Amino acid sequence: MKKFCQKLVGNKELIKINYYIAPLNKKTHPEQYLEQQKFFNELKKIKKFNIILGRLEKRKRDGEIYYVEKASDVDLALDLALDAQKEIYDEAYLISNYGDFSGATNAVKDFKKEIIYVAIGNRKVVSHYLKNVASRTFYITKNFISDCKLKT
């Protein structure tokens, strides 16, 4: 993950990496929960890496139970804007295709900071909202990913 982020920023200083996610439910998904915790433990070993936890809320529709991730998007948007206000960074890299981050992206630009939208996936899933408001867009390619893989 750090190699991916460092390749993304190039020769610029990497201030911090924030990863926003909701932990899985230990009772309903015990095996996946353990795997996720192992993954988190590996990520915690990376210098400057922060895991910001949201939550999963249980929902039911037509007799089917499903979970919705909550708070991660709000936490990310707040951190983008508040860190820009606090002069913590000059450039932020937003790795998400969630168009609702366009408001936070505009807020960052109001503080005279650059925000780079990092688009992953094919052009059909790219957020045109983010693309239109970001300072610039960087497309992740297969070659970029291949260069970041660990060499064994």
How would you describe each model-predicted region?
Residues M1-V68, E114, G121:
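Domain-level signal for Mg2+-assisted phosphodiester chemistry and nucleotide/NA-binding surfaces
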